[in-house]
Amino acid sequence: MSLKHFLNTQDWSRAELDALLTQAALFKRNKLGSELKGKSIALVFFNPSMRTRTSFELGAFQLGGHAVVLQPGKDAWPIEFNLGTVMDGDTEEHIAEVARVLGRYVDLIGVRAFPKFVDWSKDREDQVLKSFAKYSPVPVINMETITHPCQELAHALALQEHFGTPDLRGKKYVLTWTYHPKPLNTAVANSALTIATRMGMDVTLLCPTPDYILDERYMDWAAQNVAESGGSLQVSHDIDSAYAGADVVYAKSWGALPFFGNWEPEKPIRDQYQHFIVDERKMALTNNGVFSHCLPLRRNVKATDAVMDSPNCIAIDEAENRLHVQKAIMAALVGQSRP
C-alpha cells in the first residue's frame, strides 16, 4: 500500500475531501481529542508564517500530539535538493537524509516552501515538497508551496457554513486578481480555482489581462473538475460583468507568469490595475455576496476597510477553519508508514 500524502486536493477523491470537511466541522464543535496522542509532527518552514504555524502547532496539541518547528537556514541546517550536486557551498545536508531522519522521529511532516520567483519552469515542479514526499517514510502535508490545499479546505468549510449546506453547486464564484505592490505567489489562486470548480460552482477567473491567467496545469485541473462536478468556468477581464450576481468573491494578488523572474517590466503593468481593489461599489453588484481572502491582506490596497469590516466578509471564519481542517488532515494521515 502506497503512502498517502496531502500534497494537493486533486490527488484526493471528492468523497475523501467531503470526509475531511465533515471531520473538520466535528473538530470545530469539539476542540479536544486524542487522535494524535503520543504522535508528533515536524513543521518545516522555509518561509514565514503566522496562521499556518499557529494553527498546526495548536491543532497537534489539541489532539494530544506534539509539533516541532524547524526553519532550515535559520535554526536548522540549509538543505540541498539536487542529486549529483557537489555540496561544497552553503548547504550542509541533503534532503535524502533530512526526510528519512525526520521520518524516524516523527509521524507526520509539514512543509512550507514558496517559489524562488526566478524561473517558473523550475518552480512549477514543486521540487522541495516532492522531494520530502519522495524520501519521507511518513505522510507529508503541504503547508503552502505552489498550491495551498489546507487553505482550500478552510475556504470550502467557511462557504458551506455560510450557505448552510455542503452542496455549493450553482453558486456564482468570482476569483478576482487584486493589486499588490509586489508580485506574489500564485499558490492560493491556484488552490481557490481548484476547490471552487471541484465543488461544482460557476467560476469566473477575473484578471486584468491574459498575462495574469493562471498556469495551464491549474486551468486544466479546473476544466477537468467542471466536467466531473458540473458548474462552469470562464475567464473575464471585465470587472462589472464578473461581479454581477456573484454569490462569492474571493480575492488574491499574484504576479503575471510571463514575467516570472523578470519582474521590473511587469510592475508598471500591474500598477495600472490598482482599481481592481475590492470595494463597496463592486460588492454592491453581487447577489449579497460574501467576500473572503486567505490573509494577510493589505487594507485599502487589496480590499477596502468597509469590505473587510462588512458582515459579508468571512475571511476570519476561513482563517479559523485552518485549525479545524488541519486537525482533520493530520488525523486522517497519522499512523501510516513505509519501510
UniProtKB/Swiss-Prot annotation:
Carboxylation at Lys-302 increases the catalytic activity of the enzyme. Is potently inhibited by N(alpha)-acetyl-N(delta)-phosphonoacetyl-L-ornithine (PALAO). InterPro entries: ArgF, Asp/Orn_carbamoyltranf_P-bd, Asp/Orn_carbamoylTrfase, Asp/Orn_carbamoylTrfase_sf, Asp_carbamoyltransf_Asp/Orn-bd. Carbamoyl phosphate binds at residues 49-52, 77, 112, 148-151, 294-295, 322. The modification N6-carboxylysine is found at residue 302. It holds the Pfam family OTCace. The lineage of its organism: Bacteria, Pseudomonadati, Pseudomonadota, Gammaproteobacteria, Lysobacterales. Homotrimer. Its main location: cytoplasm. Its EC number is 2.1.3.9. The keyword Transferase applies. The gene is argF'. This is N-acetylornithine carbamoyltransferase. Catalyzes the transfer of the carbamoyl group from carbamoyl phosphate to the delta-amino group of N(2)-acetyl-L-ornithine to produce N(2)-acetyl-L-citrulline. This is a step in an alternative arginine biosynthesis pathway. The enzyme has no activity with ornithine. GO terms for biological process: arginine biosynthetic process via ornithine; citrulline biosynthetic process; L-arginine biosynthetic process.
